[in-house]
């Protein structure tokens, strides 16, 4: 009986230590959940989820967008995956999509209800993905800065989204 009690205490102590090292995801936690993009379905439909995975050690965003056929252009689907993680004290993210892109981001939360993902400096264009809390929903934007103007981000996509019920 004592050995069973000892095993239980060791397990409990290990579980408490694991819980203590799970990131709080402060500033990002409001994104966790299932979201549906709002807008004109004739332009496309989509949605995304943010979820804790690997015991809460990472956040994973899964995103999709379905675009209808337009003229000679066939319908298409865009899928992407982003893993958000801690690297020392820094929050980082890696993004992959169905078009073959891979983007490394630094992540910041400059204000409550605001998250910015800014791509690492590289020889090519830089990217900025932003989320802003708007009451129960959010506004999102994706911006691109050309190689010769590294901080001059221009809008590429913008959207609003609501939590799925």
Regions found by a protein language model. Give the residues of each.
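Hydrophobic alpha-helical segments and their boundary regions
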Residues: 2-3, 22
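Bacterial N-terminal signal peptides
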Residues: 3-15
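Hydrophobic small-molecule pocket/channel-lining residues, especially in calycin-type beta-barrels
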Residues: 19-165
């Amino acid at each position: 009986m004592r050995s069973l009690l000892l095993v239980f205490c060791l397990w409990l102590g290990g579980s408490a230590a694991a819980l203590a090292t799970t990131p709080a995801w402060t500033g990002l936690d409001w994104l966790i959940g299932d979201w549906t993009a709002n807008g004109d379905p004739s332009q496309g439909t989509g949605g995304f989820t943010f979820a804790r995975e690997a015991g809460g050690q990472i956040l994973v965003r899964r995103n999709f967008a379905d675009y209808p056929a337009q003229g000679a252009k066939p319908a298409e689907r865009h899928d992407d995956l982003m893993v958000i993680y801690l690297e020392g004290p820094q929050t980082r993210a890696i993004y992959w999509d169905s078009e073959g892109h891979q983007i490394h981001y630094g992540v910041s939360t400059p204000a409550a209800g605001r998250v910015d993902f800014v791509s690492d400096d590289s020889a090519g264009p830089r990217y900025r993905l932003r989320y802003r809390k708007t009451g129960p929903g959010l506004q999102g934007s994706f911006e691109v800065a050309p190689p010769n103007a590294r901080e001059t981000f221009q809008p590429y996509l913008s959207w609003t989204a609501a939590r799925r019920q």
